[in-house]
Amino acid sequence: MTLQKPFPDRPLTLAVLGSSGAVGAEILKILEERSFPIRELRLLASERSAGQVQFFKGEDLVVKKVSPEGFEDVDLVLASAGGSISRKWRKVINSAGAVIVDNSNAYRMEPDVPLVVPEVNPSQVFTHKGLIANPNCTTILLALVLAPLSAQLPIKRVVVSTYQSASGAGARAMNELKQLSQDVLNGNIPKSEILPYSLAFNLFLHNSPLQSNNYCEEEMKMINETRKILNQSELAITATCVRVPVLRAHSESINIEFAEPFPVEEARKILSNASGIKLLEDIQMNRFPMPIDVTGKDDIAVGRIRQDLSNPKALELWLCGDQIRKGAALNAIQIAELLLTRS
């Protein structure tokens, strides 16, 4: 099924699938902040979350159990309920005539599904066949930096290490980090139930499943999705992903090798003018981006841009970005806003 018809020239009937999760709740906040044109908003989730009340534009809205009836006459579905739910309901949603912006990893690497970061490859939105995939959070942050730099000089290789907050594992993981940190301070042994190990005053390699190549699933997402977004299938890129005891916002240490030497000041200028990026560098005070700088913010923060002393063609830099906002909810809504431009 190909769904490339423009949206109606009126406010949309919009469904948020998975509205009760951390990303779903953030979607509601951002829809209101950006005055997204909504005629009717439907909140859909699992049976466990049905009956919950969420707040939107001064009104209490009741979350309903996801069902085929919930998608009748819907124009757009923002889905953040996980890959299995997206796969289960895609055909039903598209058959009802709605377009899906999907936050899960279910369809990201499907050849005919656009994988979009609006600041990087916006035209891909209009190639959709009923579903547009939202990239992984760490991939979005990385792509925002790589795209404007690669427009200046070809990139030969990327080495990235991530420092991923509890928010990447959802609201329950954030609450667990708070509780286990208090347990440690009280002299008790922390017992993790949501994450595989205690994150309180601790860090561990990302807990997604290991693949046959000994990279974890999260690392392979970054590698494969970045290649697809930048349309560089042979890009040399490697990643190491780590979960750290931060509540919200991810960080990344990035080494980028170019085809030729890239002057540091030129890179600073390009990134400072790039959409979605705030340059944060106070060299005198040794002050660079931190997760608290970007928590609740739309833009990512980039700094510590410097020459790689071991490679004259490489630069080092550091970034922080809110995983729930630009890494998920905001990016999905920006995709929806692009779709509106074809109305």
Curated annotation (Swiss-Prot):
Residues at which NADP(+) binds: S20, G21, A22, V23, R48, S49, S167, G168, Q323
Binding site for substrate: Q164, R243
Pathways per UniProt: Amino-acid biosynthesis; L-lysine biosynthesis via DAP pathway; (S)-tetrahydrodipicolinate from L-aspartate: step 2/4; Amino-acid biosynthesis; L-methionine biosynthesis via de novo pathway; L-homoserine from L-aspartate: step 2/3; Amino-acid biosynthesis; L-threonine biosynthesis; L-threonine from L-aspartate: step 2/5
A single BP term in Gene Ontology: 'de novo' L-methionine biosynthetic process
Alphabetized Pfam families for the sequence: Semialdhyde_dh (PF01118), Semialdhyde_dhC (PF02774)
InterPro entries: Asp_semialdehyde_DH, Asp_semialdehyde_DH_beta, NAD(P)-bd_dom_sf, Semialdehyde_DH_NAD-bd, Semialdhyde_DH_dimer_dom
GO molecular function, one term: NADP binding
Top class in the EC scheme: oxidoreductase
Active site: C137 (acyl-thioester intermediate), H250 (proton acceptor)
Keywords per UniProt: Amino-acid biosynthesis, Diaminopimelate biosynthesis, Lysine biosynthesis, Methionine biosynthesis, NADP, Oxidoreductase, Threonine biosynthesis
Binding site for phosphate: R108, K221
Enzyme Commission number(s): 1.2.1.11
Family statement: Belongs to the aspartate-semialdehyde dehydrogenase family.
PANTHER family (alphabetical): ASPARTATE-SEMIALDEHYDE DEHYDROGENASE, DEHYDROGENASE, PUTATIVE-RELATED
Oligomer status and interactors: Homodimer.
Function according to Swiss-Prot or TrEMBL: Catalyzes the NADPH-dependent formation of L-aspartate-semialdehyde (L-ASA) by the reductive dephosphorylation of L-aspartyl-4-phosphate.
HAMAP family: ASADH
Name assigned to this protein: Aspartate-semialdehyde dehydrogenase
